[in-house]
Structures are given as structure tokens and as C-alpha cells.
């Protein structure tokens, strides 16, 4: 099947790209291996998207999907098992068939890295969150935990300290990986309590989280149970871009190297959203990337066709 534009992923960046693609007159398809919407469907309420005071993650995803498909974009749910971006048109092979497209946007996102402890999956969306900026306000004046030792974890702890009564910051090492200025700010914040050289052994609760159990990572101090209403996990993101590494450059974290124009090193191949190198990974930046990448793809195809 032949398309003008093929988008890999149907999250916020992917569906935004599809909207801009079809509005530019491109025959557009999204290939998604899970559910449309991406990570945002796990967020109970979105309160930081400009122009929309409040909306659930599922509602937001539904509206994006309906807007894209009503304009004419197609969304297929298939696993990609091969590709060739060196040809024109480019080829994407799935478990069902081969797709051809003149331009491709990679918008497969990046998944939050999980701890892998007991209770994590059971309480996701019920007290376990991977986004303090998205969900922190649900825990106003309550006790929460943040797990991680990098800039994101410490910045999350600082953000939550202004909302929550008490923040327990848990890190498996005895020193933080965050910048010195952020570490000092955390240490000076009275309602942030540090638990260094500790690992999370279990997240506890009934219908929602009510405690977290941590263990001494280096000695034999045993375990401690901390009563808490929320657990914010910030141990990094995990892109899955090795299938593309022949056609794009990857940074040390596995993200696709692409600038603000979303262009990769391969002609006609773009990267949008959380999958690419960037400083801020939020809903609004993913939507912006999708628009930029699709506009770039449209300009690329116009330029290519005008030379024929």
C-alpha cells in the first residue's frame, strides 16, 4: 500500500503529525503497535495543556484520534518487523503487509522506565505516577514519595514540595546524579526527606496506594514502610529505537538525534515527540513536534515533486 506520509506511532506527536499531514493534502497513515494516545492515556487528568483547563488522558487521546481520522488519516495497529528507508519510496514491513511512503515520521515515543517492584503495575494510575507535572496536584497537602536520583527526580521532588505536605525522596545510591545546584536546593527544602542507598521493594495499598516499603541497598538495616498516598517514579525514559539505527543517529540515551526542525540524517525521515533529543518532554512539545515534522515532510515532498 502506497502513502505520501507514514507516521510510526499514534501518540500525541504521531496524531498531531497525522492531522497536519492530511491538512497539507498528504495521504497519511499511522502505524501503532499498542493503543492510540500513547503514555497520556495513563494520566487521570491533564491540567497543563494550553487552552484546555482540564481533560482526562483518555478523553484527550480520543479527541486527537477522532480529529485525525475524521480528516482522513488512517490508523492501523500492527507490529513493525522490518524497514528500508534508503529507497524511494521508503518501505515499512509489518506482520501484515508492506507499506510504502514518500516521507516517514518516527513518533514512537519513549516509555517511562519502570522500577519492576511489586505493586508498581497494579497501582499505576491509582497512586503510582511517572509525571509529577501531570499528576502532582492530585496529592495536594498529602505525603508522597519520589524515586530516582537524577535531575528529573529532584526537580519533581522540589515541584511536589510546594504542593504536598511531605516528600520522601528515595535513591538507590549515596549520591545524586543531578546538578549541584538542584541537589543543594533539595537539601535546603525542609519538607523533602532523603532516603539514600535505598531501593523500593514494594508499593502497598488497597484500592489506591497507601504506603511504600524500602530496603537498605548496601547494609543490613532491613526494611522501612513509609505511609504515602502517591509514588512518583523518575528513573529515566526508555526509547526503543534500535530498529532505526541504520538510518538515524542515536545519542547515548538511545534517542534519535534531530533538531527543532525534526529532521534526521536521512532525507525524508523525521523524528517527533519524546523519541528525539530534546530538553522538555511534555504533551504540548509532542504536539508541536508533530506539526513541525509534518510541515517539514510536506515541504520536502513539494520540493521533490517540483524537481520532476
For every predicted segment, state its role.
Residues 2-4, 77-78, 140-142, 197, ...:
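Phosphate-coordination loops involved in phosphoryl transfer and adenosine-cofactor binding
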Residues 116, 122-138, 234-282, 289-292, ...:
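FAD-site-proximal beta/loop scaffold in flavoenzymes
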